[in-house]
Amino acid sequence: MNRTIMSTGLRWLWLALVVLALDLGSKQWVMTHFWLGESVPVIPFINFTYAHNPGAAFSFLADIGGWQRWAFSAIAVVIAVVLLVMMYRSDKRARLSNAAYAMIIGGALGNLFDRMVHGVVIDFIDFYVGNWHWPTFNVADVGICIGAVLIVLEGFCRPAGKTASQKG
């Protein structure tokens, strides 16, 4: 198979870099300008609240041992590699799936960086309605969630019998 990288889904990796840059940049800004635990209202339903999360998305498994840092790091690496392979095997015209994979890769790498460098994931977006608060999250989590939603949407929108990696 003699394909150039630009003819594959890997040409969408720029989107992973955008998600990664926005994630790391926003976290650096929060760590520089906020005290841990400090909360600042942004708009009526969002605060920026600097938090450390030793668990996974939405603080899943945050309150146990310490092994989850390494387990979630390994999972992030495996997911990123699997999605890179899928992007390589995919045609560049499979825009929705490649964009979704790239966003998930960018988010996974952003949270992986935090786990490796800080030992925890830096979270700061606090969405709330009244007194009910969603678990604090970050830009990487947003990228991962949007990517997952795009994959589900693609599953509903794809013509029957055609896969994302098939060439048009």
Curated annotation (Swiss-Prot):
GO molecular function terms noted in the UniProt entry? aspartic-type endopeptidase activity
Keyword list (alphabetical) reads: Aspartyl protease, Cell inner membrane, Cell membrane, Hydrolase, Membrane, Protease, Transmembrane, Transmembrane helix
Q: How does it sit in the membrane?
A: Multi-pass membrane protein
* A Pfam family of this chain: Peptidase_A8
Q: Which domain of life is it from?
A: Bacteria
Q: Give the transmembrane ranges.
A: 5-25, 70-90, 102-122, 137-157
Stated EC number for the protein is: 3.4.23.36
Q: Give the chief site where it resides.
A: membrane
Q: What biological processes does GO assign it? A: proteolysis
Described purpose of this protein according to its UniProt entry: This protein specifically catalyzes the removal of signal peptides from prolipoproteins.
| The protein, known as | Lipoprotein signal peptidase
Q: Which organism is it from?
A: Sodalis glossinidius (strain morsitans)
